[in-house]
């Protein structure tokens, strides 16, 4: 499958702002089941992009906006060829052993409520892979997915469970927190999801055809496997993996000291029409 992606982020600054340091994570990597055919990154500011890798091996670009300016616009655009690997990840850049991804963060803390939720999966299944699938099903049935901006600060694991509804990022936080409690390494993934029907002008499901978050968990004998509890399935050829970290903060597509953020995202089968999904958030 070939997926055409366009991701535009515009961030507002205080009028006359100068010397703003910016980091963007908007460049995916190739791995088994995902091949980057072409990819470009454009800015509305005349500055020099410095390419580098972060601690997790994500491709990043850093730059400084000298100013004065009141906004910054970043456009990532390209085409990716994907294949279905039944969610099993091979050929990804691995900077750390799986055990590092047992570490909790503020967004993935295993509170008593999260622990009780995770223990339900332990009671129904004995083997790690079965527990991960049971966890995905239970989460899908417990927390309703609601569309939310990728830059809007997903809920913590505890907040998502307590509210009973969350965007894909909050759901991924709950899955990773619960899996880590069970002793199964889990990590946060950002990326894109194309609709299954190439003729769909508009996505029929929330979060389809736009930026999305999901989780990967490590199962002995299998390795890393992607789990999208919001949709109750493992990754397919409709997913494009962008960045990996311990939680949503680590995969943020843009980090700076700006104010309001707006983004427009499309991720569609190259055979079908293109439709932009819009989001807006306040930092």
Label the predicted regions.
Residues 11-15, 44-51, 158, 185-189, ...:
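N-terminal start-of-chain detector that recognizes signal peptides
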Residues 24-34, 39-41, 231-252, 256-261, ...:
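Glycine-rich, small/acidic residue-mixed loop/short-helix segments
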Residues 170-260:
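Hydrophobic/aromatic-rich core segments of domains that either
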Residues 194-200, 276-283:
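Intrinsically disordered, low-complexity linkers and terminal tails enriched in Pro/Gly
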């Amino acid at each position: 499958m070939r997926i055409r992606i366009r991701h535009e982020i515009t961030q507002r600054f205080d009028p006359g702002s100068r010397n703003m340091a910016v980091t963007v994570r908007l460049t995916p990597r190739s791995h088994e089941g995902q091949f980057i055919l072409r990819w470009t990154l454009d800015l509305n500011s005349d500055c020099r992009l410095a390419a580098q890798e972060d601690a997790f091996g994500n491709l990043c670009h850093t730059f400084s906006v000298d100013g004065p300016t009141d906004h910054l616009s970043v456009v990532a655009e390209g085409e990716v060829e994907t294949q279905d690997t039944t969610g099993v990840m091979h050929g990804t850049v691995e900077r750390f052993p799986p055990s590092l991804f047992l570490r909790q963060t503020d967004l993935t803390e295993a509170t008593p409520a999260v622990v009780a939720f995770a223990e339900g999966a332990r009671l129904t299944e004995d083997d790690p892979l079965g527990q991960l699938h049971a966890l995905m099903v239970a989460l899908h049935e417990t927390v309703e997915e609601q569309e939310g901006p990728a830059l809007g600060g997903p809920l913590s694991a505890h907040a998502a469970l307590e509210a009973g509804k969350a965007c894909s990022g909050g759901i991924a936080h709950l899955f990773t927190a619960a899996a880590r409690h069970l002793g199964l390494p889990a990590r946060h993934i950002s990326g894109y999801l194309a609709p299954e029907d190439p003729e769909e002008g508009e996505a029929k499901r929330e979060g389809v055809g736009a930026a999305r978050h999901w989780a990967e968990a490590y199962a002995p004998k299998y390795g890393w496997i992607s789990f999208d509890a919001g949709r109750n399935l493992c990754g397919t050829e409709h997913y494009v993996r962008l960045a990996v970290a311990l939680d949503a903060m680590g995969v943020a597509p843009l980090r700076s000291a700006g104010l309001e953020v707006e983004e427009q995202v499309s991720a569609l089968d190259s055979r079908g029409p293109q439709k932009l999904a819009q989001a807006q958030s306040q930092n």
